[in-house]
Amino acid sequence: MSNYPEPNVIPSKEYEELIDAYKLMHKDERAFMGISLIPLTYIIKSIFEENKVKSFLDYGCGKGLLYTKDFKKADKGSKYPDLKEPIQDTFGITKFSLYDPAYPEHAEPPTKQYDAVISTDVLEHVPSQDLDWVMDKIYSHATKIVFLNVCGAAAIKTFPEGKHKGRNVHVSLFDNEWWVNQCHKIRQKHKHLKIYLTWQSTKGIVGTCIKGEEDGTTKSDRSSDKTAG
């Protein structure tokens, strides 16, 4: 892992308001445990192995319960893989960091770069006007790959109180093609990276891999029920 210079960004007022709202929601011990990572576990493990990943950052990890001895508390039933050990042990990686600006235990901004950054069920929680700088920040922490998972549908949760009471917590809803184009756009500053973008569909987990070609262009490889390599 190498040192990382923190970029100068000015979050929108809405971003700061929503972070405060998520902090309040985190007081419920059942909220944002990090379970969205569970169905993606073995997809990510395969990608890590293929790209020889030795270190990673989970950006927007929530409570990060899957990384603790209490990982089983986040296992929500048979539709998910049956985890036998904390997720970093499943990946076989000891060098990792957790970051979530709305959870005090993981709120310290990362200061290093990692082989990989993963961010699952995060970007749809970010106001649309802040997506460019948040994604640029995610990309900037990676030296090899970025793995993103997004949802294009409304969440079950709404904000329970405050200015945004009743608003769905998925504040940025876009179709899959929009996200692919957005990933391409942000990658223009990070052309050395492979970007793995996945989302849920009726066929399972569908994904695309955005990577550079020898002629300097980019391409997207798509696959269903797994992520392209």
Task: Label every model-predicted segment.
Residues I118:
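A conserved beta-strand element that flanks and buttresses the S-adenosyl-L-methionine
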Residues P127-L131:
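Short N-terminal helix/helix-N-cap motif within the alpha/beta-hydrolase-1
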